[in-house]
Amino acid sequence: ESVADLEESDTRRVPKIPLHLVIAGCPSLKTFYQGDIRHWHQLFDAACHVRPAMGISVSAWEEAQRCMGPEQASIVVVAMLERFSDIRSPGGYLRALTSKAAAGEFSCGPMVMALIGRRSAA
């Protein structure tokens, strides 16, 4: 890979959605993670904390981080937590989204906006 390829992949991985919107769309996270979340690394810590309880394997989590970047993978996991009762196989769902991300066909922004839309409609 060239430097340009690496820079392009890095910018593609930076979440295009503000952290405060992620937190607003995923209030269930506060039930399972007591720490403050003001920075992306804190969201990553929270996702690492809830991942095992959701039944997501280490290998699925690591692959998601590799394909999406740690921030977007974290967003996906905490968004999945919000809809946990609707997801039959969280590990399988994360792997499917990881495959889409690897093909350039997935962005976590619409996932979070859908959660916010559900909350405002409720």
PLM segments and residue spans:
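Electrostatic interaction modules used in gene-expression and signaling proteins
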Residues: 1-122
